[in-house]
Amino acid sequence: TRPELVAAGELEIRLEADAGARTLSVWDNGIGMTREEVVQNIGTIARSGTREFLQAIREQKGQMAPELIGQFGVGFYSSFMVADRITLVTRKAGETTATRWESSGDGYELMETERDVAGTTVTLHLKPKDEEDGLRDYTEPHVLRDIVKRYSDFVGYPICLKADTLNSMKAIWARPKEEVSEQEYRDFYKHLTHDWNDPLDHVLVRV
């Protein structure tokens, strides 16, 4: 074992929204990344497909199609659908310095910085709310609660907004059927299939 890689405290994910600054930050105290890992895993603006994806977003005025994400296979850069700029600060467990990565979609800047504990923070500098373009206000607590419940309820670590834990951390297939609502079944189906319609029916099978 490597004790320097053990997280400070229990592993968790925090959402921090600032309506005045128009930012949404996702913070964790996981293992973090080195500078080299940031370049390899995040600094992919110039890679094949990514520039085309960002260009497609700009051309999708009024139609923020989620299918673009699957088409180009660049999940992290789908953040540019809701943000003009992304800032990432990460510190690898066992290291004393952190790395700051920032991009507006046309390349990126990389520099050394500080972070109190190991882990990663991704900050989205949000575009203005635009209902016609499918952009909700991602600084609103009820919007964040809805998104986490719909898409991340069974993530195995707590996702917190201030003092509240937003997810159950238990997959619906591992819960007693009487504890799972019809809406949860419908939401889970849509999450898996990306189908906007409700399922015709559901069948519970235990093996």
Roles of regions detected by a PLM:
Residues 1-138, 146:
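GHKL (Bergerat-fold) ATPase N-terminal catalytic module, capturing the glycine-rich phosphate-binding loop
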Residues 68, 86-107, 127-207:
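GHKL/Bergerat-fold ATPase module in large chromosome/replication-associated machines
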